Amino acid sequence: MINITLFGYGGMGRAIEAAADVRADMSVNRIFDFDGSAVYCAREGKALSDEAVIDFSHYTMHDEALKYALEKNIPIVVGTTGLSDEQISNMQEAAEHIPVLYSTNYSYGILIMNHLIREANKYLSEWDVELAETHHSKKKDAPSGTAKTMLSILNEDNSKTEVYGRQGITGERSKREIGVHALRG
């Protein structure tokens, strides 16, 4: 049985807990969450040892999850979005000591879409690109981590300027722009 420590108890955290509850080979042993000001232990399990950390927390809580995994010397799976460049760099450094798996979206469909964007970008690099995403009203980051990943694929060579939203009289669109729009509702 794999004893999991879960950081983040929102929609994904609850889904992970529910999935683990029906499996005989894994158990969510501890749950840590963020109340807006501090990280607290929402559930303390009976197992003496943790064997993996799953982090689907708010980006402000991610440092605690990574620190916990490093202190326990156990693997960490990270699905938290909105991470800073420094936090991503810290994960890369941690990967020299423990297994780290990070993605802004673990959906197989998004993996395929990212591959298709990368391939299309090879042939359509001179086309005007606007990236527009729509999410539910409870989505906390805008643009989402998935949209940011797609944006980084579209601008791998850093030759384009990202323009977030447009308002008023903006003039002619530059050829080296990528428009980024996030809708919630």
What are these regions (language model features)?
Residues 7, 56-57, 79-80, 103:
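Structural motif
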Residues 28-29, 73-80, 99-101:
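Short hydrophobic/aromatic-enriched beta-strand-loop microsegments
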Residues 49-71, 82-87:
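Beta-loop-alpha module in the N-terminal Rossmann-like domain of NAD(P)-dependent dehydrogenases
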Residues 67, 80-101, 111, 115-120:
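Rossmann-fold NAD(P)-binding glycine/threonine-rich loop
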Residues 75, 90-107, 124-132:
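Rossmann-fold dehydrogenase core element
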Residues 3-7, 11-47, 125-185:
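C-terminal substrate-binding/catalytic lobe of Rossmann-fold NAD(P)-dependent oxidoreductases
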